Amino acid sequence: APVDEKNPQAVALGYVSDAAKADKAKYKQFVAGSHCGNCALFQGKATDAVGGCPLFAGKQVANKGWCSAWAKKA
């Protein structure tokens, strides 16, 4: 199941299913071009539309999504 943006955990992390809608004023660490699909936490392939994330157990995040825990994939 996809992560609901209104889920308390999602709200706390500023999760959005479309990185273009990330609150860049609130999250100064936002990096242009960052999204779930190129995050170290993303548990899918770079080509998958959705994938697992350890921050949202049992849920799937959008590849093009974003949250404040984003960390560049090595």
UniProtKB/Swiss-Prot annotation:
Keywords: 4Fe-4S, Electron transport, Iron, Iron-sulfur, Metal-binding, Transport. It comes from the Bacteria. Gene3D superfamilies: High potential iron-sulphur protein. One of its GO terms (biological process) is aerobic electron transport chain. InterPro entries: High_potential_FeS_prot, HIPIP_sf. Specific class of high-redox-potential 4Fe-4S ferredoxins. Functions in anaerobic electron transport in most purple and in some other photosynthetic bacteria and in at least one genus (Paracoccus) of halophilic, denitrifying bacteria. This is High-potential iron-sulfur protein. It comes from Rubrivivax gelatinosus. The gene is hip.
